[in-house]
């Protein structure tokens, strides 16, 4: 029989980013497996607290947003495992199954020069070298060797989509404070 740990009710920070879900209990000492949404889930390792929300569907052990203190998170095989000082056994870990994990963006580690978190690129305006607006970053796709920007733009009153490889050959500059990406790209490509 699973039982919910005592977790403090909280408010989701304005800069919260959903980074994964609690997949299942792991072992008998309260560890749990995390299904991370990123292949490089550094934010899960650096944040000392996670904000949890119940799954959208299925059984819910809690409502609203709760704060989960994190004692340790690490890679194990092909997944992430973590433990909390308030989750002491398998039954308690099982009660968290399906919970959505959020981390404050301010708790993410600083990216290296020339590297960006996808969440920081969403909503940026993309212009070409001539200053022509190509669209707004709506999504990003990982195609294996490279990432592709998915832009939304309007043409003839219709919503359209444009894709630009997010590689140095096409992206000249990313200006996060200015909320702009400059690309070597033409509207008719």
From Swiss-Prot:
PRC barrel domain location is: 113-189
Q: Name one GO molecular function term.
A: ribosome binding
Q: Which domain of life is it from?
A: Bacteria
UniProt keyword list: Chaperone, Cytoplasm, Ribosome biogenesis, rRNA processing
Which GO biological process annotations does it have? Answer: ribosomal small subunit biogenesis; rRNA processing
Q: Write out the GO cellular component annotations.
A: cytoplasm; ribosome
What InterPro entries would the database entry show?
A: PRC_barrel-like_sf, PRC_RimM, RimM, RimM_N, RimM_N_sf, Transl_B-barrel_sf
Localization of this protein: Cytoplasm
User: Entry's HAMAP family?
Assistant: Ribosome_mat_RimM
Family, according to the entry, reads as follows: Belongs to the RimM family.
Q: What does this protein do?
A: An accessory protein needed during the final step in the assembly of 30S ribosomal subunit, possibly for assembly of the head region. Essential for efficient processing of 16S rRNA. May be needed both before and after RbfA during the maturation of 16S rRNA. It has affinity for free ribosomal 30S subunits but not for 70S ribosomes.
The record's section on NCBIfam families has: 16S_RimM
Q: How does it assemble?
A: Binds ribosomal protein uS19.
Notes concerning its domains: The PRC barrel domain binds ribosomal protein uS19.
Q: This protein is called what?
A: Ribosome maturation factor RimM
- Which species is the source of this protein? Delftia acidovorans (strain DSM 14801 / SPH-1)
Taxonomic lineage of the native organism? Bacteria, Pseudomonadati, Pseudomonadota, Betaproteobacteria, Burkholderiales
């Amino acid at each position: 029989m699973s039982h919910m740990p005592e977790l403090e009710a909280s408010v989701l920070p304005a800069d919260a980013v959903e980074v994964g879900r609690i997949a299942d209990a792991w072992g008998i000492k309260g560890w749990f497996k995390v299904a991370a949404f990123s292949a490089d889930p550094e934010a899960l390792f650096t944040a000392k607290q996670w904000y949890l929300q119940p799954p959208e569907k299925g059984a819910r052990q809690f409502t609203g947003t709760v704060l989960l203190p994190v004692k340790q998170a690490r890679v194990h095989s092909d997944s992430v495992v973590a433990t909390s000082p308030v989750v002491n056994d398998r039954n308690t870990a099982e009660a968290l199954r399906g919970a959505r994990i959020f981390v404050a963006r301010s708790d993410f580690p600083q990216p290296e020069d020339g590297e960006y978190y996808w969440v920081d690129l969403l909503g940026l305006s993309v212009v070409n070298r001539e200053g022509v607006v190509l669209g707004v970053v709506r999504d990003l796709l990982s195609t294996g060797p490279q990432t592709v920007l998915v832009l939304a733009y309007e043409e003839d009153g219709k919503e359209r989509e444009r894709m630009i490889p997010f590689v140095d050959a096409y992206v000249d500059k990313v200006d996060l404070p200015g909320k702009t990406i400059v690309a070597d790209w033409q509207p008719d490509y």
